[in-house]
């Protein structure tokens, strides 16, 4: 009996007929027997992309495959590949087929107007300040931005974009087609007269667009840097002061009391020092022990080395240098004075002590002269010990001391009594008129400021911040490396920078900078008292050498011409005379090679060279040293061009460098 069920071939034909009558909607299930696996059209070989104005993928792609898009398949489904389609997305209602007939006819978008070319000079890629675009014509006259070029007749009516200009790195530009209308003249069009505009024309065009020139920017930046450098780490100006004067005038006592009154030495430490001084039988010296720290200085009551301390006022920071007042330590005093900006000349008003220090043999005169020759142009004269029973804040005694000092400082030392010198009475031991003004009941005749009040309100000092770096070496010692100490006379220094040691031409690297408070800092400027840790071959570096800029080193010479004023001389001075020269921190033996001229009171030179020189004369001479010494002309750098001559413990002359011969 034959089976009524159709065979496999007949079933396929029936299913095919049914399938052909199905509508192909968004969810219409389709099936083609023995069809190939589903492969999206864009993955088939030879696929050519066609712009789909409706966005997304066209639905007709499934009809050719004969597969249900929702059926499982080895390849990934359409939803997995296109979960976040780009461009226009299909409506979320998948059952609705998009009606493309309602879409407007597609019109290609107009090409965007080319943006103005921005020329970047000096690596600055930031946008120009002006919002007006800059157009540079490279093929003759420039087309105006408001006129559109006419399209060629062979092309469609759609607007043709302007030709593109290649980047500046290729250095090749395509000339723009000439416009039909006559353009307006501009500075940019006049600059571009050749097919390839020169670099100079491009640079001028960019400068015309930006009003601020490179030179102005550099000047403003330099001014900002200078202002930042002049602001110290605490926002206060740094000043170096040195206490000078005859032995036992009260320099160390005054310095110790300043440290206590400014809080640099706390009360507990001061009580400990006072207790130690009382046990040693020197109770009245306890304030000076804050600076005189060595056993020799405390035992003898005399300062030997230059004491160093640091204190602050409201507007300034101070490095205090306590110079020895004994005659045998004048060399140390010169070393301290060479690093100071302001000198404090301490005078004892006690009967007999003032006369001993000011008359012949005392150090008051010599210290005042040395301070002037070492570049201390402002002197504060402190009349100390006004509380002594022999004085008792006497106005008569105060004026007596001031009158004698003012005459000497004006005639011999060269200070102007009205502008360069300030006098004030104090009591270093009791602290009266040191920080706070003396009470009117104690001293009714003095109405001026106290010592610290005056130092804090002085006019600002001149600093050569922009000059090449110069720092004479005041001391050298080992502390986890080599430490070089001194005062920066010009310029500035930064950590990890290189410096040149003159006169030996040795390069060193600055690995660390420490200020007067022993704190490490990244940079320092002129006027600061610093310690530099250096790296390199420093075996030959010694005190008196100069750290300087590697690009602009100081001069080092063995022969120079100087103008000299003779102060004290036991005999006559002739050719071949030798003595010791103190210049900045260097100490070197020098000899007179030639006596060139004698100067009269008006500084007029004599026609014939003098045979000899005596006390009170001014001469011009040629001097020689055995080894090179760092120096500069006095008119160029005063602190590197002035010197002092000493012989047998006496200051015989002072001078300034006029000309460097080598």
Swiss-Prot record:
Compositional bias segments (type: Polar residues): 62-89, 122-134
GO terms of molecular function: GTP binding; GTPase activity; magnesium ion binding; translation release factor activity
Main location: cytoplasm
Impact reported for residue 571 to A: Reduced interaction with sup45/eRF1
GO BP annotation list: cytoplasmic translational termination; nuclear-transcribed mRNA catabolic process, deadenylation-dependent decay; translation
Phosphothreonine: residues bearing it: 182
Catalytic activity field: GTP + H2O = GDP + phosphate + H(+)
Annotated tr-type G domain residues: 236-464
Transmembrane regions: none
Result for mutant: residue 647 to A: Reduced interaction with sup45/eRF1
Function text: GTPase component of the eRF1-eRF3-GTP ternary complex, a ternary complex that mediates translation termination in response to the termination codons. Sup35/eRF3 mediates sup45/ERF1 delivery to stop codons: The eRF1-eRF3-GTP complex binds to a stop codon in the ribosomal A-site. GTP hydrolysis by sup35/eRF3 induces a conformational change that leads to its dissociation, permitting sup45/eRF1 to accommodate fully in the A-site.
Family classification: Belongs to the TRAFAC class translation factor GTPase superfamily. Classic translation factor GTPase family. ERF3 subfamily.
Assembly with partners or alone: Component of the eRF1-eRF3-GTP ternary complex, composed of sup45/eRF1, sup35/eRF3 and GTP.
Name this protein carries in UniProt: Eukaryotic peptide chain release factor GTP-binding subunit
């Amino acid at each position: 009996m034959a089976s009524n069920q159709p065979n496999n071939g007949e079933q396929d034909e029936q299913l095919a007929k049914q399938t052909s009558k199905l509508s192909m909607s968004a969810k219409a299930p389709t099936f083609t027997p023995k069809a190939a696996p589903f492969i999206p059209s864009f993955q088939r070989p030879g696929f050519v992309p066609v712009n789909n104005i409706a966005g997304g993928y066209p639905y007709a792609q499934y009809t050719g495959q004969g597969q249900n898009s929702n059926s499982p398949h080895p390849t990934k489904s359409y939803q997995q590949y296109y979960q976040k389609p780009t461009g226009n997305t299909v409506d979320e209602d998948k059952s609705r087929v998009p009606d493309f007939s309602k879409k407007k006819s597609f019109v290609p978008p107009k090409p965007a107007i080319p943006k103005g070319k921005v020329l970047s000079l000096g690596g600055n890629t930031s946008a120009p300040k002006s919002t007006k675009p800059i157009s540079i014509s490279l093929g003759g006259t420039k087309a105006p931005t408001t006129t559109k070029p006419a399209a060629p007749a062979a092309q469609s009516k759609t607007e043709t974009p302007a030709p593109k200009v290649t980047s500046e790195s290729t250095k090749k530009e395509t000339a723009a087609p000439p416009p039909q209308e006559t353009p307006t003249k501009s500075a940019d069009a006049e600059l571009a007269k050749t097919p390839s505009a020169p670099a100079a024309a491009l640079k001028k065009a960019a400068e015309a667009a930006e009003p601020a020139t490179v030179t102005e920017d550099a000047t403003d930046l330099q001014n900002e840097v200078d202002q930042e450098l002049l602001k110290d780490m605490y926002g206060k100006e740094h000043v170096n002061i040195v206490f000078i004067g005859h032995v036992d005038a009260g320099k160390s006592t005054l310095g110790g009391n300043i440290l206590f009154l400014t809080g640099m030495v706390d009360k507990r430490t001061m009580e400990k020092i006072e207790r130690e001084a009382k046990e040693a039988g020197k109770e009245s010296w306890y304030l000076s022990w804050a600076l005189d720290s060595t056993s020799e200085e405390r035992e003898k009551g005399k300062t030997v080395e230059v004491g160093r301390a640091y204190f602050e006022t409201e507007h300034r920071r101070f490095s205090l240098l306590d110079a020895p007042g004994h005659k045998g330590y004048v060399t140390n005093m010169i070393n301290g004075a060479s690093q100071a900006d302001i000198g404090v000349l301490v005078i004892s008003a006690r009967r007999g002590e003032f006369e001993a220090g000011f008359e012949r043999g005392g150090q008051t005169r010599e210290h005042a002269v040395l301070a002037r020759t070492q570049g201390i142009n402002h002197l504060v004269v402190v009349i100390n010990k006004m509380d002594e029973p022999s004085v008792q804040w006497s106005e008569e005694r105060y004026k007596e001391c001031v009158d004698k000092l003012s005459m000497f400082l004006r005639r011999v030392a060269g200070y102007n009594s009205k502008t360069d010198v300030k006098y004030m009475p104090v009591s270093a031991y009791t602290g009266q008129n040191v920080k706070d003004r003396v009470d009117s009941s104690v001293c009714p005749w003095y109405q001026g400021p106290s010592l610290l009040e005056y130092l804090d309100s002085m006019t600002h000092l001149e600093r050569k911040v922009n000059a090449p770096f110069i720092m004479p070496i005041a001391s050298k010692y080992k502390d986890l490396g080599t430490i070089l100490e001194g005062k920066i006379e010009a310029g500035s220094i930064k950590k990890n920078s290189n410096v040149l040691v003159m006169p030996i031409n040795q390069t060193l690297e600055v690995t660390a900078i420490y200020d007067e408070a022993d704190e490490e800092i990244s940079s320092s400027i002129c006027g600061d008292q610093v310690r530099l840790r250096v790296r390199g071959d420093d075996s030959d570096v010694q005190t008196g050498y100069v750290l300087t800029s590697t690009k602009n080193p100081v001069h080092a010479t063995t022969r120079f011409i100087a103008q000299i004023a003779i102060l004290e001389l036991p005999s006559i001075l002739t050719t071949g005379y030798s003595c010791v020269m103190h210049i900045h921190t260097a100490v070197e033996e020098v000899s007179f090679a030639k006596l060139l001229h004698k100067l009269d009171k008006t500084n007029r030179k004599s026609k014939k060279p003098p045979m000899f020189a005596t006390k009170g004369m001014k001469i011009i001479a040629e001097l020689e040293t055995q080894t090179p010494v760092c120096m500069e002309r006095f008119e160029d750098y005063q602190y590197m061009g002035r010197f002092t001559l000493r012989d047998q413990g006496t200051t015989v002359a002072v001078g300034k460098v006029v000309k460097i011969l080598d």
